[in-house]
């Protein structure tokens, strides 16, 4: 029995700003051409030049993903470790970060360092788990998957904190801002920033990470099949009750009833590139005599590429892949949650 699914996930894990898009032209060209060796070499050079820049985190993440694609697993682990360390540093300076973001809205988003979004952290740990599985280090892989699960929960708290801080920073303009938000013209402008989602997995949920964690729980960890089946049932509902998850649940049920572990082959397709953040200049009325309006750069997601169908052919048998995660949807949901704080 074989299961094939594809993950609408990108080598470009992050959604950088306009300046980053310009910087990555050669890198993206190599990746889109399937030249992962060239892509990893370009990422290495960019990290050497820009590891301490505003785009340092994003380049370390790109480097880790490119090296992994080029089968340089140990080097990929090191790159991701550096990225994680940098993101933790930014997280420890949360109060400073909030003030910087508030100031940047009056200027432009390029002035703010890219510190990593919640989905970056989750995918970092997920890729690290895959790296360790590649090296046969099961315990290390389980640690990364548990951390990825914890990061999904932590992002709920981070987002609530961001929105609360943004509201406090509004200060005396709060009533004017509410009036602005309720005006028809402004509402139309702000609605144009909302991403279009084909799927909604819920706040800060990555179904692929959850599935991989459940898979490792029942196949690698001792006495974790019950936890795995709980996770699989949650994923089953999140994805709209797909057949392959239903069959996965049946397989784990058999194990819980004393059956043997089945011999399975899982084929994972990773396709596409992540959406990128564009800056849109909007003139927003504030209904204040001293500050009648403000011109600011607001972020808007722009999807890139289009979905592809994937399949595996074994002899005369063709097995079509099923989508388990669209990163466009994961990133778009995160973006939707972030917008109230920005606005």
Residue ranges with predicted function:
Residues 44-48, 84-92, 149-152, 156-157, ...:
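Amphipathic alpha-helical segments of tetratricopeptide repeats
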């Amino acid at each position: 029995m074989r299961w094939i699914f594809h993950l609408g996930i990108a080598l470009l894990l992050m959604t950088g700003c306009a300046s980053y898009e310009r910087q990555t032209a050669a890198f993206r060209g190599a990746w889109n051409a399937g030249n992962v060796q060239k892509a990893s070499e370009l990422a290495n050079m960019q990290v050497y030049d820009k590891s301490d820049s505003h785009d340092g985190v994003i380049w370390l993440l790109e480097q880790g993903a490119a090296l992994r694609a080029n089968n340089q697993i140990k080097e990929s682990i090191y790159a991701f470790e550096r990225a994680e360390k940098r993101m933790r540093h930014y997280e420890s300076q949360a109060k400073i970060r909030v003030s910087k973001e508030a100031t940047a809205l009056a200027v432009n988003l390029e002035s703010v360092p890219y510190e990593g979004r919640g989905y970056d952290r989750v995918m970092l740990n997920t890729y690290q788990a895959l790296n360790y599985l590649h090296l046969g280090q099961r315990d290390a892989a389980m640690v990364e998957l548990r951390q990825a699960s914890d990061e999904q929960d932590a992002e709920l708290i981070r987002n609530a904190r961001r929105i609360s801080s943004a509201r406090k920073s509004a200060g005396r303009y709060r009533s004017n801002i509410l009036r602005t938000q309720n005006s028809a013209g402004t509402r139309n402008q702000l609605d144009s920033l909302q991403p279009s989602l084909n799927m909604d997995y819920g706040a800060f949920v990555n179904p692929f990470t959850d599935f991989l964690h459940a898979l490792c729980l029942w196949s690698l960890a001792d006495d974790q099949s019950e936890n795995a089946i709980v996770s699989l049932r949650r994923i089953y509902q999140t994805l709209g009750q797909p057949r392959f998850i239903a069959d996965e649940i049946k397989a784990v049920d058999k194990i819980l009833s004393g059956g043997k572990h089945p011999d399975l082959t899982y084929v994972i397709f990773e396709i596409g590139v992540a959406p990128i953040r564009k800056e849109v200049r909007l003139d927003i009325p504030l209904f204040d005599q001293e500050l009648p309006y403000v011109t600011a750069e607001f972020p808007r997601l722009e999807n890139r590429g289009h979905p592809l169908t994937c399949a595996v052919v074994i002899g005369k048998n063709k097995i079509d892949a099923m989508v388990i995660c669209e990163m466009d949807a994961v990133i778009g949901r995160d973006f939707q949650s972030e917008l109230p704080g920005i606005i």
